[in-house]
């Protein structure tokens, strides 16, 4: 059972919070259904606040309470003032013929009003200070805490053990790091201050009500318990749905990140639509949840407003009774009514704050759960033994092991192995038998389930984890380089290494020569996952990185598998030298590389069945003997033909020209060359680069995306206008009510009051429907827009050409971050926010119209302050927009570092570079933090000005109002009407200004999204243009093709390459690492177009053929195959996305690739998930799946780039036979370093310096005694050494 496949499994851990949002194994679904929605406690959300943050929050809260108390206190002043006016009303009934007796009361009234104006101004000054401190301090505290949460979360991820990553998968963690922490940031900042402000307004309103008129307050409060209950239900519903919505978006984010990370594979197999469907499926789930949330929340909201208006009706009726019976003055009744009114309306204004806080609690549950998860193997721990010296004696004693993700499948079943200090031990055996697992256990990436592993007689569990890993150097099968310079990549081996030591290590690894040919030499950027370099070049840098550690123990897992013949011979010599004095464990499928090992251990089914030297094991005729026999048969012809001494050949022909050592960049089929002109500062993403050439977008353009939902907007806007107009309508009723309490018959007064009370009840019933419809329609339209934006953005990304993905700014991490944050920020200014803005605008607009009708002079005075509020709003928007832009760039830069570290966590851990990545990440968080500090002050100042102007305008209003009344220009009731209409309007305007930060962010994000939507790629994967030939024979011609990668125009790759392969022929491309072989494959796939010359298929230029048709004719198997985190069956079926591939066909394909028996041993067989990038499978198993994936599309042309390099001997033989069979009747282009696999090719082409130097059959090229002859000679010599 070749079951090393389980080694990096991603089956999900049962019984943990992550189950709520994971891609999830079927076995956990039942458990997850039973689980409750998880939220953390409100105070726990602030667990990362230090004394300074707590001080900020305390002062911010105190000031929020002071700010919130301002309006109810103002109502006391208003009540007293109303009594003054009503008492004096009889004196100012006539507009003309003033008598001397009227002048004195007029002067007294004006003096009284001046006193009240000072009260208002005093309150305004207090609010100016309080509002600034409230907003700025809460924003400052949030910025500081978010920085700490990001740091702690990233630190927690880096310290987890490998078994945790196997269960979790890495892609969702990146989504959590961007999306979820943004939600926490939204929930713990200024919105908390605004919540306390609203709560203070609520309580202050009721306290004032009780003091001024407890009877009336109690009557109004009778309805409050029902109101409170509906608010509680509303909050609960919101948080439940928010949690589910988060989970759906996390899944969508994981799909997007996976597809963007494997973009070449997606495009080559035409999988864009399939990825888009997978993505949209999760988005649809999120949308449905969002719509349900909108319905539930807004029914609660409608009920709340119905209850509020019902309480007003009751208040008016009872209040009028109290005034008529002389228990209350009209001023008292007004104070009580207005205080309760303002207090009750503050509940509605708290709604977005409660929503944001609920989202934050849901997001924080998952984040804090990960932070609190204590790993059993903690690489940050200082505990454990750190010996002064290590000899390097290793002992594996009865080691049993199963991967945590697949506890029921045993990998090692009693491994026993002793390695003496300085010895080299080679582990051999079939793919998936447990060899790599052994190396992982030695590094303590996992702990054995039974048995012990010791170094120098000490159990490795007693060593300090970091110390243990530092004495071990690792070179793995698929080396991971980081997106920085070559020198920095080598420095990851050991932090304090000098440049001289780097050069020494590079020379030992045979990489010095190719590095010195690069324009930037050691400062050349290697691209994401080392994509600028060929496989061989990456491998040599990885070897240099291991050597620079000067490790006591060296672990080589297929360290030379990706090298060409010449490099392999030289690197092998370097490794032999490096092994001197070190304990070395080697895994190699190419057995010629391990025959000089001191001990060779034969693995079979998780145990060592034999060990000894090469000659001893050959005599035993066991596992090793069988493997050697199978492997040597392939290269026998070579060894028979070359008994000649290589030195003689060189002397005779002057061969092995320097030319074929050429190290011009080749791009491994994963990604192309990316620009390195810019050195280190490119890593920081040039400050202006991200937003250069991104034109600003009008918000109408965003709304146009919602035009199909126009009926929702029409209904929502009408309802918002009605809701906005309801409040000024109350102003008219109020002024009429005050007018009733002049002189007159009490029975008539009571009758009129009853009528107005019924009007209020009617408004309540109306508001139930209008508030529900407003919230629901805008909410639904917002959810649809969100889904559409995300879907369009992802679709637009998948449409782009390779040169766009080669750009450093468009790395997987940056794109995933952009996909999550841009959508969230645009949604932040649409949907329910848009509804509130429409409502508040209608409120102010209606208020102004009514005010002009009843008193234009006073209205003009009040409106004269509006420009000041507007200017402060505009300044706020501009400054916040600048901050949003800087913030976005800095967070994307941090996101890239995090994504790279998380995706390559095994390499980071092996190199003990967790601290380095953490410090890089923390450094990138400084700028967003500095921005948040600036933003706090800007936002605080502008917010406080807009809030305080309201009070100053009231001071002016009533002072001027007194003058107008005294001079007979207005009646008191009209002053009240104008005042209250403008009060409600100004409150609304104040709340509208609080959305400025969201709007600033949304504008920037919208600009980014539209620049992406509108970008026309040079090669459009979605294009329907071009020829669709009925028949394709399969002949391929390259005519004088010249090509440089777009991002490095000064580095020629192909320089006039011409070659032809006829229908059904097999063409083999050979040449040294980096000579342009894979570039040929990429041009054929039309990842790029040649700069000069043509690529022809059946005589037709590739550019003229429809791109989808063209790629459908090609099947590709690359050097490092990329599998997707879905089932084995789905991965095989991915080969042909134009149809539904049947299960029978999938099984037949698996049998043909010799992987069916292995799949049958798995618990879920073909439904087994292969893990992130296929990490549950061994290299050989992945490669076999990739071959079947390519063949299932029945291509006319088969492209094999090192298709068998990762296979063990036994698998290689079987797969090679399968490939030989697959080639029948097909045109085949093969790239191979192992020349024994291509000797039967119809045509072998030797590429050097981007041109064809030799071509012919195996025999013809041998006869020429040229470059190919030398390559074969070296390889045959290595095979027989």
UniProtKB/Swiss-Prot annotation:
Any single GO CC term annotated in Swiss-Prot or TrEMBL for this entry: clathrin-coated vesicle
Cell compartments where the protein resides: Cell membrane; Apical cell membrane; Membrane raft; Cytoplasm
Annotated ABC transmembrane type-1 domain residues: 57-359, 713-1001
Keywords assigned by UniProt, alphabetized: ATP-binding, Cell membrane, Cytoplasm, Cytoplasmic vesicle, Glycoprotein, Lipid transport, Membrane, Nucleotide-binding, Phosphoprotein, Repeat, Translocase, Transmembrane, Transmembrane helix, Transport
Enzyme class name: translocase
Transmembrane regions listed in the UniProt entry: 51-73, 119-139, 189-210, 218-238, 297-318, 333-354, 714-734, 758-778, 834-854, 856-875, 938-958, 975-996
Activity regulation information from UniProt: Translocation activity is inhibited by the ATPase inhibitor vanadate and the calcium channel blocker verapamil. Translocation activity is enhanced by the addition of the bile salt taurocholate.
Residues with PTM Phosphoserine: 27
Similarity annotation: Belongs to the ABC transporter superfamily. ABCB family. Multidrug resistance exporter (TC 3.A.1.201) subfamily.
Name this protein carries in UniProt: Phosphatidylcholine translocator ABCB4
Species the sequence originates in: Cricetulus griseus (Chinese hamster)
Lineage start: Eukaryota, Metazoa, Chordata, Craniata, Vertebrata
């Amino acid at each position: 059972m070749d079951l090393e496949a389980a080694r990096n499994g991603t089956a999900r851990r049962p019984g943990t919070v992550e189950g709520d949002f994971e891609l999830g194994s079927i076995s956990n679904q039942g458990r997850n259904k039973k689980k409750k929605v998880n939220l953390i406690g409100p105070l726990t959300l602030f667990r990362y606040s230090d004394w300074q943050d707590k001080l900020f929050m305390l002062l911010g809260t105190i000031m929020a309470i002071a700010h919130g108390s301002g309006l109810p206190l103002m109502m006391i002043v208003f009540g007293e003032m109303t009594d003054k006016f009503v008492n004096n009303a009889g004196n100012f009934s006539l507009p003309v013929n003033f008598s001397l007796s009227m002048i004195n009361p007029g002067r007294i009234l004006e003096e009284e009003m001046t006193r009240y104006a000072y009260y208002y101004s005093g309150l305004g000054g207090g609010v100016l200070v309080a509002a600034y401190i409230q907003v700025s301090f809460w924003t400052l505290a949030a910025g500081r805490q978010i920085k700490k949460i990001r740091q702690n979360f990233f630190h927690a991820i880096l310290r987890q053990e490998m078994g945790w990553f196997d269960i979790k998968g890495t892609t969702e963690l990146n989504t959590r790091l961007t999306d979820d922490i943004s939600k926490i940031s939204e929930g713990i900042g200024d919105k908390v201050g605004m919540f306390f402000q609203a709560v203070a307004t609520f309580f202050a309103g009721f306290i004032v009500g009780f003091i001024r008129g407890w009877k009336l307050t109690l009557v109004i409060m009778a309805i409050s318990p029902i109101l409170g209950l509906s608010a509680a239900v509303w909050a609960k519903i919101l948080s439940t749905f928010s949690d589910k919505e988060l989970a759906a978006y996390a899944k969508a984010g994981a799909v997007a990140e996976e597809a963007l990370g494997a973009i070449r594979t997606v495009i080559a197999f035409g999988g864009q639509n399939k990825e888009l469907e997978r993505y949209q499926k999760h988005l649809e789930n999120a949308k449905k949840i969002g719509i349900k949330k909108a319905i539930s929340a807004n029914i609660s909201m409608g009920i709340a407003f119905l209850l509020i208006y019902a309480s007003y009706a009751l208040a008016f009726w009872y209040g009028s009774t109290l005034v008529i019976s002389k228990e209350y003055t009209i001023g008292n009744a007004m104070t009580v009514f207005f205080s309760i009114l303002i207090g009750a309306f503050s509940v509605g204004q708290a709604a977005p704050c409660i929503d944001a806080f609920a989202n934050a609690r849901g997001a924080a549950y998952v984040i804090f759960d990960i932070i609190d998860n204590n790993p059993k193997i903690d690489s940050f721990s200082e505990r454990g033994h750190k010996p002064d010296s290590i000899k390097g004696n290793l002992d594996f004693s009865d080691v049993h092991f199963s991967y945590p993700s697949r506890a029921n499948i045993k990998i090692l079943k009693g491994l026993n192995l002793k390695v003496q200090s300085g010895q080299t031990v080679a582990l051999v055996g079939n793919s998936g038998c447990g060899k790599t697992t052994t190396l992982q256990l030695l590094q303590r990436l996992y702990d054995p389930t039974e048995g012990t592993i010791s170094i120098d007689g000490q159990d490795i569990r007693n060593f300090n984890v970091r110390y243990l890993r530092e004495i071990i150097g690792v070179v793995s099968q698929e080396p991971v380089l980081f997106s920085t310079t070559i020198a920095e990549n080598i420095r990851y081996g050991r932090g304090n290494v000098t440049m001289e030591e780097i050069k020494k290590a590079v020379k030992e690894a045979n990489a010095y020569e190719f590095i010195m040919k690069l324009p930037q030499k050691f400062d050349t950027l290697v691209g994401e996952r080392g994509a600028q370099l060929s496989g061989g070049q990456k491998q040599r840098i990885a070897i240099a990185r291991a050597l620079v550690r000067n490790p006591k123990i060296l672990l080589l897992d297929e360290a030379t598998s990706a090298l060409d013949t010449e490099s392999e011979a030289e690197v092998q010599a370097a490794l032999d030298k490096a092994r001197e004095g070190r304990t070395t464990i080697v895994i190699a499928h190419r057995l010629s590389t391990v025959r000089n090992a001191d001990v060779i251990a034969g693995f079979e089914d998780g145990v060592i069945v034999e060990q000894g030297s090469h000659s001893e094991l050959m005599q035993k005729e066991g596992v090793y003997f069988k493997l050697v026999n199978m492997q040597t048969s392939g290269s026998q012809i070579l060894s028979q033909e070359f008994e000649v001494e290589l030195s003689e050949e060189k002397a005779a022909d002057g061969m092995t020209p320097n030319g074929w050592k050429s190290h011009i960049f080749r791009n491994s089929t994963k990604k192309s060359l990316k620009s390195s002109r810019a050195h280190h500062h490119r890593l920081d993403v040039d400050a202006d680069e991200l937003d250069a050439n991104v034109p600003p977008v009008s918000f109408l353009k965003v709304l146009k995306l919602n035009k199909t939902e126009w009926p929702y907007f029409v209904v929502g806007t009408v309802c918002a206008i009605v809701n906005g107009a309801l409040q000024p309508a109350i102003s008219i009723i109020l002024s009429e009510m005050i007018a009733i309490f002049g002189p007159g018959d009490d029975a008539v007064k009571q009758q009129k009051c009853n009528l107005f009370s019924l009007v209020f009840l009617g408004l309540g019933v109306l508001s139930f429907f209008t508030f529900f419809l407003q919230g629901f329609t805008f909410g639904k339209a917002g959810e649809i827009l969100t889904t559409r934006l995300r879907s369009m953005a992802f679709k637009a990304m998948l449409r782009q050409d390779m040169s766009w993905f080669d750009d450093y700014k468009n790395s997987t991490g940056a794109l995933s971050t952009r996909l999550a944050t841009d959508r969230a920020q645009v949604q932040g200014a649409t949907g329910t926010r848009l509804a509130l803005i429409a409502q508040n605008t209608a409120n102010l607009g209606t208020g102004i119209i009514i005010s002009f009708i009843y008193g234009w002079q006073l209205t003009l005075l009040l409106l004269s302050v509006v420009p000041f509020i507007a200017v402060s709003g505009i300044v706020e928007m501009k400054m916040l927009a600048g901050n949003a832009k800087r913030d976005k760039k800095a967070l994307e830069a941090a996101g890239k570092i995090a994504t790279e570290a998380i995706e390559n966590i095994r390499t980071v851990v092996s190199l003990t570079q967790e601290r380095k990545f953490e410090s890089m990440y923390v450094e990138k968080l400084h700028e967003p933090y500095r921005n948040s500090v600036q933003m706090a002050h800007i936002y605080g100042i502008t917010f406080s000005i807009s809030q305080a102007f309201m009070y100053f305008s009231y001071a002016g209003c009533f002072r001027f109002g007194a003058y107008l009344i005294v001079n007979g220009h207005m009646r008191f009731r009209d002053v009240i009407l104008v005042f209250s209409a403008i009060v409600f309007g100004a409150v609304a305007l104040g709340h509208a200004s609080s959305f400025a930060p969201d709007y600033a962010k949304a504008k920037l994000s919208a600009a980014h999204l539209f620049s992406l939507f509108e970008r026309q790629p040079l090669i459009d994967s979605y294009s329907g243009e071009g020829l669709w030939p009925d028949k394709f024979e399969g002949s391929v011609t390259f005519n004088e093709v010249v090509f440089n990668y777009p991002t490095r125009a000064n580095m020629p790759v192909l320089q006039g390459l011409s070659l032809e392969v006829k229908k059904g022929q097999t063409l083999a491309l050979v040449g040294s690492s980096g000579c342009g072989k894979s570039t040929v494959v990429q041009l054929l796939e039309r990842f790029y177009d040649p700069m000069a010359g043509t690529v022809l298929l059946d005589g037709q230029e590739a550019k003229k053929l429809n791109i989808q048709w063209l790629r459908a004719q090609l099947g590709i198997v690359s050097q490092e195959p990329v599998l997707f985190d879905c089932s084995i069956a789905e991965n095989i079926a991915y080969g042909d996305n134009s149809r539904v591939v049947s299960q029978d066909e999938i099984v037949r394909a698996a049998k043909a690739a010799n992987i069916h028996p292995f799949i049958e041993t798995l618990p879920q067989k073909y439904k087994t998930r292969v893990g992130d990038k296929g990490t549950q499978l061994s290299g050989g198993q992945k490669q076999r799946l990739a071959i079947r994936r390519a063949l299932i599309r029945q291509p006319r042309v088969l492209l094999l780039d090192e298709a068998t390099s990762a296979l063990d001997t036994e698998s290689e033989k079987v797969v090679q036979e399968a490939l030989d069979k697959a080639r029948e009747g097909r045109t085949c282009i093969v790239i191979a370093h192992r020349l024994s696999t291509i000797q039967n090719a119809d045509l072998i082409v030797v590429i050097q310096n981007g041109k064809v130097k030799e071509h012919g059959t195996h025999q013809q090229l041998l006869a020429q005694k040229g470059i190919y002859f030398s390559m074969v000679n070296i390889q045959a010599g290595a095979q027989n050494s």
